[in-house]
């Protein structure tokens, strides 16, 4: 799949940040873009900026969210990029409820939507993309359960692919982890600020030590490539050097 003209694309959590860049990318390709997010205000702004994009204000962590979303549009491409802002506090200073936020948002969204498309399969050839994080590989000591939650998304992606293959559903499941924090997103800017404080350095020094980072556009381009390359699903990492498969 390389031509996205009139292809139904549903994005979960795409009213801002990386998700918005993905929405802009698919819109520019002529796709039938449907964006789901919690915030009505940010959705209205996106709809004004991207004429023709449909939106739905919905808490994607709710048990009925997947059924509501899939009833509006059956996607040929489903992208799960929703999640919570990280707490950015070292874990000894967190209680369990604050520590656990990413499990109850990012992972729960993946759990619910992956189950839904396996219970009521999308049409053959459909692709489901889960946005994970490089934190799933390297950890993130001031982000609560974020690293573990993003790692679990990778596992769920693999489980979903195996379940699809066993049922002969001809669906492709892909997870993509941006390797570095991206200053261009709200999540990334907050992480850079708080990690600089945590390490006792300036933001510039933290970024310099981190090395070159991929941009949101790099990530969007990687998503398009993984959807259209005709290869099996799997877990992938995107960095400033390009896309690589994760074992």
Spell out what each predicted region is.
Residues 92-111, 129, 153:
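Catalytic Tyr-X3-Lys loop
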Residues 12, 75-83, 106, 130, ...:
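Rossmann-fold scaffold of SDR-type NAD(P)-dependent oxidoreductases
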Residues 196-247:
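C-terminal helical subdomain
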